[in-house]
């Protein structure tokens, strides 16, 4: 079981490296790692388990965050009342198209690898299309908008050595871009 001690923190060199593409089929160890990443998210969202093991709640985890420089992410976004939830373990995900319109979270973004609160708006594409493989090597294509699009972009950034705060405008950190939508 992964815990917070398995998650590397800001400043660790792996978080700034471009992660390696995975060859398919995945090895047994790679599959186990991806399943453990998803399990961390499930546990982190369970109040009792999170309290018992000191887990910070998360909706996404990228392999570089557990010091594995490979292009794998797990995303688990619970239903917010809209009837939609997102539960994916993706291999070699790529954003293949995106909107011009930007979106941002009014409270900014957080990260399991960043212990401090970083003030500032993170502008991302409001709509994206992702192509990836699932854990068994099957093709997946996702069209995402709003909050899920933001979460997936955050995790894919980790695969490219990019941290969320890299997107914050240093001169005007709390100023929304023109035409950007608040999510």
From Swiss-Prot:
Q: Which domain of life is it from?
A: Bacteria
Pfam families the record matches: Pep_deformylase
Q: Which GO terms describe its molecular function?
A: metal ion binding; peptide deformylase activity
UniProt xrefs under CDD domains: Pep_deformylase (cd00487)
Spell out the reaction equation it catalyses. N-terminal N-formyl-L-methionyl-[peptide] + H2O = N-terminal L-methionyl-[peptide] + formate
GO biological processes: co-translational protein modification; translation
Which residues carry out catalysis? Answer: 155
- Positions binding Fe cation in this chain are 111, 154, 158
Could you tell me the EC number(s) of this protein? 3.5.1.88
What top-level class of enzyme does the UniProt entry assign? hydrolase
Question: InterPro entries attached here?
Answer: Peptide_deformylase, Peptide_deformylase_sf
- For whether the record's keyword set contains Transferase, the answer is no
Q: Which cofactor does it need?
A: Fe(2+)
Q: SUPFAM superfamilies recorded for this chain?
A: Peptide deformylase (SSF56420)
The cofactor note reads: Binds 1 Fe(2+) ion.
- Biological role stated in the UniProt entry: Removes the formyl group from the N-terminal Met of newly synthesized proteins. Requires at least a dipeptide for an efficient rate of reaction. N-terminal L-methionine is a prerequisite for activity but the enzyme has broad specificity at other positions.
**Similarity section:** Belongs to the polypeptide deformylase family.
The record's section on NCBIfam families has: pept_deformyl
Q: What is this protein called?
A: Peptide deformylase
What's the source species for this entry? Staphylococcus aureus
């Amino acid at each position: 079981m992964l815990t917070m001690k398995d998650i590397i923190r800001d400043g660790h060199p792996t978080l700034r490296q471009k992660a390696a593409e995975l060859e398919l089929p995945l090895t047994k160890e790679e599959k186990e790692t991806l399943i453990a990443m998803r399990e961390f998210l499930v546990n982190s969202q369970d109040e009792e388990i999170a309290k018992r093991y000191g887990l910070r709640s998360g909706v996404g985890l990228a392999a570089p965050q557990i010091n594995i420089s490979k292009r794998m992410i797990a995303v688990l976004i619970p239903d917010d009342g809209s009837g939609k939830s997102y539960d994916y373990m993706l291999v070699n995900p790529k954003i293949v198209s995106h909107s011009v319109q930007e979106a941002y979270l009014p409270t900014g973004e957080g990260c399991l690898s960043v212990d401090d609160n970083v003030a500032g708006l993170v502008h991302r594409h409001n709509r994206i299309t992702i192509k990836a493989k699932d854990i068994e090597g099957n093709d997946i294509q996702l069209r995402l908008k709003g909050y899920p699009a933001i979460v997936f972009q955050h995790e894919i950034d980790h695969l490219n050595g990019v941290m969320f705060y890299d997107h914050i405008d240093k001169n005007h950190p709390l100023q929304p871009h023109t035409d950007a939508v608040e999510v």
